[in-house]
Swiss-Prot record:
It comes from Bacillus pumilus (strain SAFR-032). This is Adenylosuccinate synthetase. Belongs to the adenylosuccinate synthetase family. It comes from the Bacteria. PANTHER family: ADENYLOSUCCINATE SYNTHETASE (PTHR11846:SF0).
Amino acid sequence: MSSVVVVGTQWGDEGKGKITDFLSENAEVIARYQGGNNAGHTIKFDGVTYKLHLIPSGIFYKEKTCVIGNGMVVDPKALVTELAYLHERNVSTDNLRISNRAHVILPYHLKLDEVEEERKGANKIGTTKKGIGPAYMDKAARIGIRVADLLDREVFEEKLARNLEEKNRLLEKMYEAEGFKIEDILDEYYEYGQQVKKYVVDTSVVLNDALDEGRRVLFEGAQGVMLDIDQGTYPFVTSSNPVAGGVTIGSGVGPTKIQHVVGVSKAYTTRVGDGPFPTELHDEIGDQIREVGREYGTTTGRPRRVGWFDSVVVRHARRVSGITDLSLNSIDVLTGIETLKICVAYKLNGEITEEFPASLNELAKCEPVYEEMPGWTEDITGVKNLSELPENARHYLERISQLTGIPLSIFSVGPDRSQTNVVRSVYRP
């Protein structure tokens, strides 16, 4: 048995899709366990760039099983669209399995997400408006519709009718927005269910059987630890648990079966949406990193906020996710910057702290305490191992590993999977 979890150590967009794709080569099963199509993965495979939002990155390997776990919320329309996108590019999806326990995103979730964000105005969270939060709200309120319900027309119609009474009242009375008729949703979404029916199984059985048979299973997290609803910068977070602990809940695999946790990080920090960001850059260096690193959201196209590497954030991620291996991406983006900075602690009310505060008011007052390191000018995009890196680049990586307390296992010097280098295997016993 060999199981590896891939999590983002920052606010998402760390390059998890690329690393998951890279690690998928040696995995036999690849599973997602939380989130929905609010996550964006850009993957290069055989010279072609693909953008996925819902389906696991391992779909390009025909012999590997790809799982959409029970902890996810699935937009059936988006799923059918993504399947068609892959089929048009001659990518087989026969290796996909979808949990019958996953919850379903319906049009009223999308509408509620949109109108609630508009209502908040200046206090908005920065949601992707994909209906993720409202779907998880229904799940917690025990009125959600699951994939198993979607496949049974009678059950689907009954639950949909009951939910529409409440949702329409909410939309019309509170938001002064138009509600939905049952016929607007029922036939269309039941048909989506029929189109994906062949993929639907109890994925907990699939995953546990694979592990019991000694197969390599890779769990793919979406977003990042700092967007975790419990451990992140609440309320500027997602509605699920991207931390490694989310695997056991969102996949139906027990905690004793998780072996290694890979924390994926950029060599700097980015963030999409609102909320405090202690190391954020508002200068030419920030603009340079954004443009060189093409820091624009895969899902939204929004420019990402950019800042220096924050070891306080990544240490927090290591602790709450039990990270055993560090994968450091986008090192090449920093080439040409004369002096690099790493945040080693925060200054709060005149005192130094190395812990990440729970209070956003406190976080907003935190000033980063920086350690400066000399940069490098050499082209590193063709580097294949640590010894080939310029001395300053190697020292930068070593310092990040020291400050975060996570051994470096993978480093990446460009967007292509061939620019990903292994220092030590994450599939070790």
